[in-house]
Amino acid sequence: MLSRLETKPSAPHCPRTTSRGIVRRMRRPVRRLARPRIRAELDATAVPTWRPPRIASADATSLHFVLSPGWLPRGRRVYAIGDIHGCLSELQQLHAAIAEDVAQRPSASIVLVHLGDYIDFGPDSAGVIAHLIARPVEGLRIVNLMGDHERTALDALAGDRAAATDWLHTGGDTTLASWNIRADTPRGGWRSMVPREHLAFLQSLALEHRDGSYLFVHAGIRPGVELAEQNEDDLLGIRQSFLASEQDFGAIVVHGHTASPSPVVKPNRIGIDTGAGCGGKLTCAVFEENAVAFMTA
């Protein structure tokens, strides 16, 4: 069942690094504010934990918007879904909720961004890829970003022995099983057993997407490095130096990769990996003008 987010006492158990964060509760979207005011509103040391009430569904009338540190031009909307990790049922629920929201609240320009990590850990990585290939929400521009798990899988399937070992220890065994590849299959035979269209999908993934003042990436960026000069390793795998930074990145970075019990909203970034595939939920952020709402499955 889809529900609005509420803070949990601890992060879901998962072999992935977690982080905690809080946001201030707002009752409705507000006009864009100057950056100093936004920073003050979102100062995590000065505001209480946000605990919205439970609801039965995430339809258009139930979206609960809060002030966002970023903005989109009027008439534009972006849906961004965090790390999926093989959770096909939850992804289908969010896509259905997005389709319903779009039907009830049309907008001039709508983009759906998936932030990567479609595979590993969860029960149906192959099903997730097939679902994404089928363009699950009609009428939207869809951007599929690469995650570190896709990068590792591609390297492993290309014959990188170290990557193959890493992959097997970080959920790759569940992905292989979803392709009906037995654990004792020689590694050199994996690639030939992966559906051709699935491999093409993995190879087609983008590293980033820009919209308004937002930069959508899988993991984050390297502080102190110009956005145009960021490297793939950081975009797919950075953690602490990015998460701990309070500097202005030149864009509000929307990312996954580091799991937390609920979305993390900071003056310079918004994290929406909430532990899907590892006991947590799958989160979708909805961006409009200078506001953001969250729905989960």
Residue ranges and their predicted role:
Residues 166-271, 275-281, 287-297:
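Acidic, His/Gly-enriched loop-helix segments that form or flank divalent-metal centers
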